[in-house]
């Protein structure tokens, strides 16, 4: 378990001190009592990514040093879980804003009275297909996809409903040379059409869903992103996106591109690259869309489930 506190001091790399790739404790600078840096306890999951963070109260404004320490841990572990956070909507929006402002959430109407919070929910008796059950990186079809996502557990079923994450740095590192040679230099074609176009999964024929999803022809637009790319903050190479929002590769016809996408998703979601996250009520989870794929799982029929979600805007380099 590592402990982090305070702002960056001498010997920093980025926003935290490192030795052997692991963040170390940082001595806090004098601050007011209200904004005094908190000491974070970070416990890695022991899986391919993910860590549990305690020693911080996210219902209070955070000191710059605490924010820097959380960001360093986020970049290192890719998924952070903060248990025991009885956050309201103001708290969730304030926390999100520390890490780059709000991303644009298309196709899903925000909760009443808020512009940046959407409800990820499912009623106990709902029969519509599970939302977001396939691997994806949130909104990868945008020109500037969000850097991260924050998800706050409000009503959590007693069974099921885990979220799985897959580390795409690890997936690239372990990829066989022959497969890697086939993807070098490829531009992936991203689109929301399979999900959010009027003919898509969440389109006109999607009935009985409690989430407020609004399909639109805007989902037919396409964007190109490198399939192998450097993380904009850490510089580490990884895979970005997967079949679903990726509908092909520029320069490859479907007879070649679609079988390659299928082969890749089998690789990208392998067990050894995964972290299986178990939810708790009042738990906030933040993850890095630039490093990961994720997907929802079911297993909680007969139970309500409600989480509030924000997205962190693409990193501006500051």
What residues fall within each predicted segment?
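Leucine-biased recognition of intrinsically disordered, low-complexity hydrophobic segments
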Residues: 4, 22-24
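Non-heme Fe(II) oxygenase catalytic core, chiefly the N-lobe of the double-stranded beta-helix
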Residues: 25-284, 290-318
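Short hydrophobic transmembrane-like helices used for membrane targeting/insertion
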Residues: 1, 13, 26-29
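Extreme N-terminal basic, low-complexity initiation segments
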Residues: 1-7
């Amino acid at each position: 378990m590592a402990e982090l506190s305070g702002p960056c001091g001498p010997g920093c790399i980025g926003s935290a001190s490192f030795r052997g790739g692991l963040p170390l404790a940082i001595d806090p600078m004098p601050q007011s009592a209200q904004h005094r840096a908190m000491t974070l306890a970070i416990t890695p999951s022991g899986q391919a990514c993910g860590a549990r963070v305690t020693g911080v109260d996210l219902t209070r404004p955070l000191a710059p040093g605490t924010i820097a320490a959380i960001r360093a841990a986020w970049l290192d572990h890719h998924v952070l879980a903060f248990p025991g956070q009885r956050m309201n909507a103001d708290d969730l929006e304030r926390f999100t804003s520390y890490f780059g402002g709000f991303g644009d959430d298309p196709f899903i109407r925000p909760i009443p009275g808020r512009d940046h919070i959407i409800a990820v929910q499912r009623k106990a008796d709902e029969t519509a297909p599970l939302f977001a059950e396939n691997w994806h990186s949130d909104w990868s079809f945008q020109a500037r996809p969000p850097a991260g996502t924050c998800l706050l557990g409000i009503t959590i079923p007693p069974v099921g409903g885990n979220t799985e994450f897959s580390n795409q740095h690890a997936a690239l590192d372990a990829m066989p040379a022959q497969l890697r040679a086939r993807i070098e230099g490829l531009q992936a074609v991203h689109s929301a059409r399979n999900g959010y176009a009027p003919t898509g999964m969440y389109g006109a024929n999607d009935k009985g869903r409690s989430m407020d999803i609004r399909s639109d022809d805007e989902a037919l637009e396409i964007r190109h992103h490198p399939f192998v790319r450097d993380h904009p903050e850490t510089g580490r190479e990884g895979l970005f996106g997967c079949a679903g929002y990726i509908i092909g590769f520029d320069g490859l016809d479907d007879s070649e591109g679609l079988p390659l996408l299928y082969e890749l998703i089998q690789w990208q979601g392998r067990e050894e690259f995964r972290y299986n996250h178990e939810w708790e009520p009042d738990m906030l989870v933040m993850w890095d869309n630039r490093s990961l794929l994720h997907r929802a799982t079911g297993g909680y029929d007969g139970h309500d489930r409600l989480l509030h979600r924000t997205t962190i805007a693409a990193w501006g380099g500051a």
